[in-house]
C-alpha cells in the first residue's frame, strides 16, 4: 500500500483528490496539508465539505517539520496548489526522492522560456523540469510509469487533446478552433465577485491569451485557436472543436482514428451523437461526439469532462495508478 500526502487539500481539487485516494484500497493518506497561513489549518476536511464526512482527517499546516514527515512517511505527494507554490514544493519533494503529481502548470512546459510569458515567473529548477512528464493518462502511460515528476494536465487541455490527438495525421495545417465552456469551480474556491452566483453569466474570457492555448498547441504539435468561456453552472467542461480535414479523408478514416480509445475505459466516442455536461459530472470519464461534413472537409467534435475529475483530480489518480503499476 502506497502512502500519499496531499498538499492544498482544502481547495475543490484537493478535496476531490483526497476523496479518490481515500476510497482506493491500494493507497493510504499520509496527511492533508494547507499553507501555514491558511484560515483552514486545524479544521477537518468534513467541516469544510460535509459531503466528505466519512473522511476523518484534519488539515495540518505545511511546516518544515511536516515536510520532513512527508519525506519520511510518504511514497508520493499530490500538489493541489498554485503554480507559484508548486514550483518550489515539487522540486523539493522530487529531490527528496518522492514521486510528485503536480496539478498546477508549473511543470507542464518542457521549454523554460514559456514560463515568464504565460505564468509570470522564471523557472529556476531546470534539472527537475527536464525530468517532468506530461500526465495525459491515455497517451503518456510509459512516461508516467517511468518518471517521478508528473505534471498533470490542465482541464481545458485534457478535454481538447483527448478529442484532437487521434486526428493529428488527418488534419490540415489550418488551425483547429476550440470553443470551451467551464463551470465556475474552475476558478477555485476563493471568493471572487465575477464568479459569485449573481454575477455569473455565459461569457468568454482570456480571449487569444489564455495559458492553456500554448499547452494544447505544444502537446498537439499544432497551433490552435482557443476561446474559453465561463458558464453559469458549478462543474464540468464542454469543448466544441471545429477541424479541417485533409482532402480525401472519410468518415471511416475518422472512426478508425478514434479506435485508439477502444482500450481506454474512461473515454467513450460517439458518432453523430453529442455529450452534455450532465453526462460526465462527478465521473472520471471523457465523452466525445463527432460529425463530419465530407463535402466541405470539416469535422466537429465535442468533448465533455468534469473539470474537477478528469480535468484534475481523477486524472491525477489515474497517473498515480499508472506510476505505481496497479
Curated annotation (Swiss-Prot):
It is found in: Cytoplasm. It comes from Shewanella loihica (strain ATCC BAA-1088 / PV-4). One of its GO terms (molecular function) is NADP+ binding. Keywords: Amino-acid biosynthesis, Arginine biosynthesis, Cytoplasm, NADP, Oxidoreductase. Belongs to the NAGSA dehydrogenase family. Type 1 subfamily. Pathway: Amino-acid biosynthesis; L-arginine biosynthesis; N(2)-acetyl-L-ornithine from L-glutamate: step 3/4. It is an enzyme of class 1 (oxidoreductase). It catalyses: N-acetyl-L-glutamate 5-semialdehyde + phosphate + NADP(+) = N-acetyl-L-glutamyl 5-phosphate + NADPH + H(+). PROSITE patterns: ARGC. The keyword Zinc-finger does not apply. Pfam families: Semialdhyde_dh, Semialdhyde_dhC_1. NCBIfam families: argC. Its main location: cytoplasm. The keyword Cytoplasm applies. The active site is at residue 155. One of its GO terms (biological process) is L-arginine biosynthetic process. This is N-acetyl-gamma-glutamyl-phosphate reductase. It comes from the Bacteria. PANTHER family: N-ACETYL-GAMMA-GLUTAMYL-PHOSPHATE REDUCTASE, CHLOROPLASTIC-RELATED, N-ACETYL-GAMMA-GLUTAMYL-PHOSPHATE REDUCTASE, CHLOROPLASTIC-RELATED-RELATED. InterPro entries: AGPR_AS, AGPR_type-1, NAD(P)-bd_dom_sf, NAGSA_dehydrogenase, Semialdehyde_DH_NAD-bd. Catalyzes the NADPH-dependent reduction of N-acetyl-5-glutamyl phosphate to yield N-acetyl-L-glutamate 5-semialdehyde. Its EC number is 1.2.1.38. One of its GO terms (cellular component) is cytoplasm.
